[in-house]
Regions:
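Domain-scale activation on soluble regions of proteins
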Residues: 1-145
């Protein structure tokens, strides 16, 4: 379950970068290729745009989300921890049994997934609005941007 949640976060961040951001597609794909499975690296690639369009003054939501992302990244940097029982050198990831507060972990992951979906919808709306504005500028004034 933890792997699937983590993977959902990774894919949500990649969706923001490729589909919803103002990053041109060649640069977006380069970011994805370079950052691979690093949710912190992916987040750092999109945070400026998120701050520009989504952040409200005195809102601590982004700070809280950044803490979630850092915690999840630090716990499973390569996205292997919950996918495989051991690393490439055959050393087990968990020698001692680990007990997780699964309800709390699930809550944090779901909050992060919900926020990424919210950011996606906001950035998508902004891009649609900008596209409509360009069409209007062309139709009304003959201006092509």
């Amino acid at each position: 379950m933890c792997y699937l949640y983590r993977n959902a976060i990774e894919l949500g961040l990649k969706r923001l970068i490729i589909e919803d951001s103002h990053i041109d597609s060649s640069k977006a794909f380069k970011i994805i290729r370079n950052k691979k499975h690093s949710i912190l690296g992916l987040w750092n690639s999109i945070i400026d745009e998120v701050k520009k369009y989504v952040n409200m003054p005195d809102d601590i939501t982004l700070d809280n989300l950044q803490q979630y992302i850092k915690a999840f990244h630090n716990f499973d940097k390569s996205s292997d921890l919950f996918r495989y029982p051991c690393d490439k050198d055959m050393s087990p990831y968990f020698i001692e049994p680990k007990k997780l507060d699964i309800e709390n972990v699930a809550f944090c992951f779901e909050e992060l997934c919900n926020f990424l979906a919210y950011v996606s919808s906001i950035l998508n709306e902004i891009k649609d609005y900008e596209s409509d504005m360009m069409v209007d500028m062309k139709d009304c004034y003959g201006i092509i941007l």
